[in-house]
Curated annotation (Swiss-Prot):
Residues 1-7, 65-87, 150-182, 251-259 are extracellular. Putative taste receptor which may play a role in the perception of bitterness. Keywords: G-protein coupled receptor, Glycoprotein, Membrane, Receptor, Sensory transduction, Taste, Transducer, Transmembrane, Transmembrane helix. The lineage of its organism: Eukaryota, Metazoa, Chordata, Craniata, Vertebrata. Belongs to the G-protein coupled receptor T2R family. It holds the Pfam family TAS2R. The keyword Disulfide bond does not apply. It is a multi-pass membrane protein. It comes from the Eukaryota. Glycans are attached at N161. Several bitter taste receptors are expressed in a single taste receptor cell. The gene is Tas2r104. It comes from Mus musculus (Mouse). This is Taste receptor type 2 member 104.
Length: 302
């Protein structure tokens, strides 16, 4: 049985997960409709669709995993099925971070304004940059996946033999976990760099506008601000997501604190949920589609 606080926290986390599924499904449907209507899928819509689909899978996997651990259903679930879920999560999580980073790079190349020849080369050859990101995804995935397999195998051994914990140092567990996530972490660092460069670009642009005596925000400034909101939100939420997964992992190995585990689940569910709604609110097309959907719902009610 769960305590009152545990039940409330689990309800909050579950609500986050369901809202995340709805928000990301909405993004997929809007972009799919646009694809069918225009007979083509733009680069930004491809990234947003891939990001939304990967997050839907992420939400279902972390929710199912959390419920099986909270209600001790892992004993009833075949170990091979749980292991398979873990491998799927590793792949989907990597893809989700890659799509988020690609979105940040897309905003950076489209909006930022630098005179450096490397930036100008990247801006003119955005398609090649996209191919490079795919290669980077494969390399980081191949580098981190073997360690992820080791961590998953360690969890499987631990669940079948609790005395194994004696041979595992806390520092070793933490190091293995961090290195197993080096792929997503390296992509996350690229997103931070893109956000930092966008900030510099905005600062330079603001100084330029002040020097010509303009007291109003122009379209370039608005574009900078929207892109930075998306990137900063991603950075903050991904840190919370990473901490949440880390808390869940440490609870599995080092303590049997169910409340702390559910708190970790609540943190991890915030990232795929909240960021999807931030994307909707900062995208003109998605915001317009949301308003149309709300108007239709009002018409149905009347």
């Amino acid at each position: 049985m769960l305590s009152a606080l545990e039940s409330i926290l689990l309800s909050v986390a579950t609500s986050e997960a369901m809202l995340g599924v709805l928000g990301n499904t909405f993004i997929v449907l809007v972009n799919y409709t646009d694809w069918v209507r225009n007979k083509k899928l733009s680069k930004i819509n491809f990234i947003l669709t891939g990001l939304a689909i990967s997050r839907i899978f992420t939400i279902w996997i972390i929710t199912l995993d959390a419920y099986t651990k909270v209600f001790l259903l892992t004993m009833l679930m075949p170990s091979s099925l749980h292991e398979c879920m873990s491998y799927i999560w590793v792949i989907i999580n990597h893809l989700s971070v890659w799509f988020s980073t690609s979105l940040g790079i897309f905003y950076f190349l489209k909006i930022a304004n630098f005179s450096h020849y490397i930036f100008l080369w990247m801006k003119r050859r955005a398609d090649k940059v996209f191919v490079f990101l795919i290669v980077f995804l494969i390399i980081t995935w191949l580098a981190s996946f073997p360690l992820a397999v080791k961590v998953i195998k360690d969890v499987k051994i631990y669940q079948s033999n609790t005395s194994w914990l004696i041979h595992l140092e806390k520092s070793e567990l933490l190091i293995n976990y961090v290195f197993a996530n080096m792929g997503p972490i390296s992509l996350f660092i690229v997103a931070i760099i893109a956000c930092f460069l966008l900030t510099i670009s905005l600062w330079r642009h603001s100084r330029q506008m002040q020097s010509i005596g303009s007291g109003f925000r122009d379209l370039n400034t608005e574009a900078h601000m929207k892109a930075m909101k998306v990137l900063i939100a991603f950075i903050i939420l991904f840190i919370l997501y990473f901490l949440g997964i880390l808390i869940e992992t440490l609870c599995l190995f080092l303590t049997n604190n169910k409340l702390l585990f559910i708190f970790g689940f609540t943190l991890s569910a915030m990232y795929p949920c909240c960021h999807s709604f931030i994307l909707i609110l900062t995208s003109r097309e998605l915001k317009q589609a949301t308003m149309r959907a709300l108007q239709r719902l009002k018409c149905c009610e009347t």
